[in-house]
UniProtKB/Swiss-Prot annotation:
Ca(2+) binds at Y43, G45, G47, D64. SUPFAM superfamilies: Phospholipase A2, PLA2. Its cofactor is Ca(2+). Belongs to the phospholipase A2 family. Group II subfamily. GO terms for molecular function: metal ion binding; phospholipase A2 activity; toxin activity. Its EC number is 3.1.1.4. This is Basic phospholipase A2 canebraxin B. It is an enzyme of class 3 (hydrolase).
Amino acid sequence: MRALWIVAVLLVAVEGHLLQFNKMIKFETRKNAIPFYAFYGCYCGWGGRGRPKDATDRCCFVHDCCYGKLANCNTKWDIYPYSLKSGYITCGKGSWCEEQICECDRVAAECLRRSLSTYKYGYMFYPDSRCKGPSEQC
């Protein structure tokens, strides 16, 4: 179910924030969010539960926590200013929400890069049904 929802949202939001986050991920990891991260582990993609499976999944868990602190922002749809230059992601000036969302995405993309050496292809299309147990606190 999570996979179908993500694909539907990405098709609708071709010019939206999710495309920006994908560009950051690709810039840092050289991998497209779909298929490499959109369905990875228990937290990469829409929603999440249980314990993160590894360092990559933990990046997504922390990203979810970051978004959780922005309850009054439209984290899935706000478009924010940013640039990709000289090996760095730089968030630009925008509304408070845009700047915070950009920072959440920047930090997550950089975390995914740092976790590349432990990426496990076995978690790439991990079924939600295997994500059990209590979720960690942010």
